[in-house]
């Protein structure tokens, strides 16, 4: 049940927003092994002049940037999966948005199963139900 938060320092063109949300969802499914039907994504656009790296506006730098955070249940992905996701996310964002500053970030944030959920139930409760244990 990942939640993907994507912030772009780029013009907010509807086709780019759709492409980036779709591609990051695909990577979450393909690399992290998450279920597409419960993967949600939000894309926010920030004017490049409002995004700085090293104290310099991206307007002046002539490049774009992004911040991506995908929230997953703790312990459900290996270090290799997380590293592959971070690399693929940067490559995908650059393919869609054009040249990006190296300080463009992708984070796989692990949240304890008892600390989050969807449809009113924690992931721990869902796991307990699957194995027949009260959570």
What residues fall within each predicted segment?
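A domain-level signal for the structural core that forms small-molecule/cofactor-binding pockets
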Residues: 1-135
